[in-house]
Amino acid sequence: MLFPRIIAASAQRKLSVYLKKGGLVAYPTESCYGLGCLPTLAKALGKLAHLKKRPQHKGMIVIGNQFEQLQPLLQMPSENLQDMLRKEWPAPKTFLLSAKSCVLPELRGKQRSKLAVRVPAHVGARRLCQALQTPLVSTSCNRAGKRACRTEREVRRQFGRDVWIVGGRIGRQKSPSQIIDGETGKRLR
């Protein structure tokens, strides 16, 4: 089954509808639970920033099940860069790549032209994107100043019923993903 094993097909459809209405979802990733939404809905991005108490000028990461799922958001990278990304991913490595002009400023960050994208090493996160047939925003699941949630229980404590929770185990990664400028190769985190 392509979807994380704990969610039935009917729940998958309900989650898809919920996200299209601007809902937020928490799901396991490499190092913690991620908090996300559809990357194309300004309403959902605003809701996510408000819930996390996150400044809206900061950009957000978008994950996909493979590079091709992220391409509609990106200006076409060079063939060399595409080859490198396909070799690097899946991995806890986020790359900043030139975004298409249609990408919402709330997503890439105000006054920024690049978008942070990743194909995660966490198989459940990739399967979630594959099953929903869409990339997802992926920020750490926590309110500003609090530790990132590492369990479903911690998500419930911090966010209650404000988010749809996809249960599962996080990966073994201890630190957040690296962030690398795709054009310069410079490591930013």
Swiss-Prot record:
Record keywords, A-Z: ATP-binding, Cytoplasm, Nucleotide-binding, Nucleotidyltransferase, Transferase, tRNA processing
GO biological process: regulation of translational fidelity; tRNA threonylcarbamoyladenosine modification
Substrates-to-products reaction catalysed: L-threonine + hydrogencarbonate + ATP = L-threonylcarbamoyladenylate + diphosphate + H2O
GO MF annotations in UniProt: ATP binding; double-stranded RNA binding; L-threonylcarbamoyladenylate synthase; nucleotidyltransferase activity; tRNA binding
Broadest EC class assigned to this enzyme: transferase
Any Pfam family matching the protein: Sua5_yciO_yrdC
EC number: 2.7.7.87
Ranges where the YrdC-like domain occurs: 9-189
Subcellular location: Cytoplasm
One Gene Ontology CC term in the entry: cytoplasm
The UniProt record lists the keyword Mitochondrion: no
Record carries keyword tRNA processing: yes
InterPro entries, A to Z: DHBP_synth_RibB-like_a/b_dom, Sua5-like_dom, TC-AMP_synthase, TC-AMP_synthase_SUA5
Domain of life, source organism: Bacteria
Main location: cytoplasm
Family: Belongs to the SUA5 family. TsaC subfamily.
Role of this protein: Required for the formation of a threonylcarbamoyl group on adenosine at position 37 (t(6)A37) in tRNAs that read codons beginning with adenine. Catalyzes the conversion of L-threonine, HCO(3)(-)/CO(2) and ATP to give threonylcarbamoyl-AMP (TC-AMP) as the acyladenylate intermediate, with the release of diphosphate.
PANTHER family: SUA5 (PTHR17490), THREONYLCARBAMOYL-AMP SYNTHASE (PTHR17490:SF18)
The name this protein goes by in its record: Threonylcarbamoyl-AMP synthase
Organism lineage string: Bacteria, Pseudomonadati, Pseudomonadota, Betaproteobacteria, Neisseriales
Name of the gene this protein is made from: tsaC
